[in-house]
């Protein structure tokens, strides 16, 4: 059975992607911050879903990913769907910094952990939900736009490391 881990699967695009993979018969690892939502997903497909509470802004997030990989007996596909974005016309520093903490620092933590896992295995797939905002800034959400541009450029750079059998 193929195995996918989705970070940020408790709502939105991540949750819908998890549902699609479950319908296709995959074993799905779902992770996010909200334990009650993770439990709902697990109960919707017992035996097919593994869960792990992960906050990508925490330094121990890669360790939590390792725990989920172990629970699942491995990982074939990694999807990062966690991210935040708020309109911030007043440029409140707290909003900008929180956005960067999740969409840059958390992104690096999780993508690098998945990259190293697949590098050791010699194969695997990494996917990230980014945004069209990464191609042209949104004046109402400067940090969001900048962090999505960062993600796109980072993934382009990782693609240059394609000497291993890992796709992005």
Predicted region positions:
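Residue(s) in the substrate-gating loop at a strand-loop-helix junction
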Residues: 131
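Active-site loop immediately N-terminal to the catalytic Tyr-X3-Lys motif
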Residues: 136-142
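Short alpha-helical oligomerization interface
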Residues: 88-101
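Active-site helix of classical SDR
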Residues: 111, 147
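Rossmann-fold cofactor-recognition segment
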Residues: 45-60
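Conserved glycine-rich cofactor-binding loop
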Residues: 10-11
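Conserved NAD(P)H cofactor-binding loop of Rossmann-fold oxidoreductase domains
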Residues: 81-87
């Amino acid at each position: 059975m193929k195995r996918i881990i989705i970070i940020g699967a408790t709502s939105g695009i991540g949750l819908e992607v998890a549902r699609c993979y479950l319908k296709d018969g995959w074993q799905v690892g779902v992770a996010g911050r909200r334990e009650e939502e993770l439990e709902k997903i697990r109960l919707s497909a017992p035996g097919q879903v593994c869960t792990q509470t992960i906050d990508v802004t925490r330094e121990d997030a890669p360790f939590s990913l390792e725990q989920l990989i172990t629970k699942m007996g491995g990982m074939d596909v990694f999807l990062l769907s966690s991210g935040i974005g708020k309109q911030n016309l007043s440029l409140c520093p707290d909003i900008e910094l929180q956005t960067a903490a999740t969409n840059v620092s958390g992104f690096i933590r999780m993508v690098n952990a998945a990259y190293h896992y697949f590098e050791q295995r010699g194969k695997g797939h990494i996917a990230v939900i980014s945004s069209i905002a990464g191609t042209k800034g949104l004046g109402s959400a400067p940090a969001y736009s900048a962090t999505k541009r960062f993600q796109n450029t980072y993934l382009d750079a990782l693609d240059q490391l394609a000497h291993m059998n890992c796709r992005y």
